[in-house]
Amino acid sequence: MRGIFLIRSRLSIFRAPAVKCLRFSNVLPSLSNNCIVRLYMEPPVACVLPLGLCSMFSTSIADSEQVGFTRSNIEKDDESDIDLGCSISDELVSEDVGKISKLVKDCGSDRKELRNKLEECDVKPSNELVVEILSRVRNDWETAFTFFVWAGKQQGYVRSVREYHSMISILGKMRKFDTAWTLIDEMRKFSPSLVNSQTLLIMIRKYCAVHDVGKAINTFHAYKRFKLEMGIDDFQSLLSALCRYKNVSDAGHLIFCNKDKYPFDAKSFNIVLNGWCNVIGSPREAERVWMEMGNVGVKHDVVSYSSMISCYSKGGSLNKVLKLFDRMKKECIEPDRKVYNAVVHALAKASFVSEARNLMKTMEEEKGIEPNVVTYNSLIKPLCKARKTEEAKQVFDEMLEKGLFPTIRTYHAFMRILRTGEEVFELLAKMRKMGCEPTVETYIMLIRKLCRWRDFDNVLLLWDEMKEKTVGPDLSSYIVMIHGLFLNGKIEEAYGYYKEMKDKGMRPNENVEDMIQSWFSGKQYAEQRITDSKGEVNKGAIVKKSEREKNFLQQPEVRKVVREHGYSFWDE
């Protein structure tokens, strides 16, 4: 009761008049000229793979910015490497995109047939066309690379940085790092100015995604080889990539190792702090970094508070959220929209919905910060999780009245309370009517849900719809599909999707690989045992028959007698 009383007493500040506070200004320290500490050797940049041979694909043995790292942000970051902003205004280009897309679909996984049909088609590639096709086939690296190489050989077409970056990102995502470095080397030979910091940042992100921290740092050192400057922004991009893919501890280590070259800076610490808060979700480690900032003389700013409040909000520590919120005001740091959104989420999660609504009014009327879609999502999501469907719908209607359009996250919250396959497809139809197309993540969520319900007919419908209306299933989609089918006894079907995934060059995680291989080994062993046992039975029957024939003259005739109803009969 005392805890609730303290929380409610703190909530009263939301109705109090606003206190005039000075905004905290963050001054970056001057850069030092000392060299960065070298922890690893530089990577080999130039590779000798013949790029012109489409059939030769190499495999690697290694497997001012806002910091908010959620799954959706990671996906957006991946997609930003692949140019998706290509609006096809030219009717001829749009027609050519349709032709190439049909070719790709008809050829399936037959790369040789695809190469032959591309050579026979009358399509002339352009920069716009290549970017669009690479975007559509980005989950099938062999198809993408086959098309990319074919386009590069056509007269009148010269690759730009956009196409190179898209292809490098696709290769890096599928761990074809050697081939990606070959493309970078080709860019350098064609024109040294083509290789920029964004090119190497794509490689850094892909190495971080597979947790190869050493090669990510090596690639950062390769900036000098390409005559690129290694400024504080580039260093913070490295930290951001490391934290985005859960290499947060390594990022924190780099800050201290390179303090002479890159002095302690609030933004650098905020990247690591946010990694512990929103990627790893470890309040203990986040508090350690928070204390380290104070120990080295780096002041906490609004981003620091936003990360910590978000961390406590997700963990359900409402009391700590309100303490930090009070502390911000005492230190004259004005909360921004992100802070308010996190506090709204914490209040709604703790069932203080009316207080959350009051805070939304306060931020709009007294602070002049209008609630956005994220603010309403922060309220809708915990309501849906608590099965308060009617209240969630009221908030949804209120959001529409304010002229805000729901995002994919809004609909994902409502998907958690669906109960039948019919409701799933009804919600998908409403999404499209509102102009919000489902993403691959949407289909993954629904496929997982329908597999739990053992509604496999609708699972297959969703899978086909995903293949038709999105860029196609990615690795995560296949893993969810294989798990859902396998754990529900649809083992042969799961194995079919496993083979399809392997044919596309995707690497499953160890759990899926072990699960399928164990079943496949057991299946082969069982089939072999059945074959062997049948052979032994047939062999034994032949031996017994031959022995009877051989000893027929030496043995007396033996006939069996059966008894039935008190009478004896010869056994026929």
Curated annotation (Swiss-Prot):
It is found in: Mitochondrion. The keyword Repeat applies. InterPro entries: Pentatricopeptide_rpt, PPR-containing_protein, TPR-like_helical_dom_sf. Gene3D superfamilies: Tetratricopeptide repeat domain (1.25.40.10). GO terms for cellular component: mitochondrion. Keywords: Mitochondrion, Repeat, Transit peptide. PPR repeats lie at residues 160-194, 196-230, 231-261, 265-300, 301-335, 336-371, 372-406, 412-438, 439-473, 474-508. It comes from the Eukaryota. Residues 1-57 form a transit peptide. PANTHER family: MEMBRANE-ASSOCIATED SALT-INDUCIBLE PROTEIN-LIKE, PENTACOTRIPEPTIDE-REPEAT REGION OF PRORP DOMAIN-CONTAINING PROTEIN. Belongs to the PPR family. P subfamily. This is Pentatricopeptide repeat-containing protein At5g15010, mitochondrial.
